[in-house]
Amino acid sequence: MYNLKNQVIVITGSSSGIGLAASTIALSSGAKVFGVDIRPPPSTLTSQSNYACLQYDLSSSSTVSDIVAACEGAFGPRIDGLLNIAGVMDLNQSADTLADEIWERCIAVNLTAPVKLMREVLPVMQRQGGGSIVNVASKAALSGAVSGVAYTASKHGLVGATKNVAWRFKHERIRCNVVCPGGVGATSIRDGVDVTQFDAAALETMALIHQAHGCDREKGVELQPQDIAHMLLFLLDERSRGVSGAVIPVDNAWSTI
């Protein structure tokens, strides 16, 4: 399906949602997948000989170098691709209602962890002569009207980091892109989020934007995790070798408003 045979791909958020879909498709394309998730992986992954994983809390303040070390222990000193998919939501809190713990968790998981992982993976890619990094942001990275200030800031920051990495390493055959999904069915990003604690006033101001996208479900065209996963894996494939520094919405045109 994709030209990934024997390539080593690190995927965060690999146990569910977009990460699980990407892991499954990558394995079917012949890749060696190293998954990272706070949750244990499903048996559909652990039964695969080319899959290894590390249960890891990306919100912790510890270094992520042990992720790369564990991957190299499983598959050797090579990393061809990195998919930074893991993410957490906020409570749609505005700057005037924002709780410190919400801000710190969103920034830690959605921005700090991906940047630290890129820092650890880039030297490996430099030594081997190239690689591809794909970060997952959100419609919230393209707008200020779809989520809270913590999630919005973290995803805007990830877009900026992506562009910086793409330009800095463009002559070393290392590509870096960011995909911005819209609403996706059957994902776990809201797991553990108490929706009754959402900032009601903020949600009210965003209602029209969410309604414009919510009708996709009613029309039967709601995006599924595999729809996002296919874009991610295309960006790892050599057929996308001219694409770097791109910000790519996958959202049924939601980003047009």
Swiss-Prot record:
This is Short chain dehydrogenase ausX. Belongs to the short-chain dehydrogenases/reductases (SDR) family. It comes from Aspergillus calidoustus. NADP(+) binds at residues 11, 57, 119, 151, 155, 184. It comes from the Eukaryota. Pfam families: adh_short. The keyword Transferase does not apply. One of its GO terms (molecular function) is oxidoreductase activity.
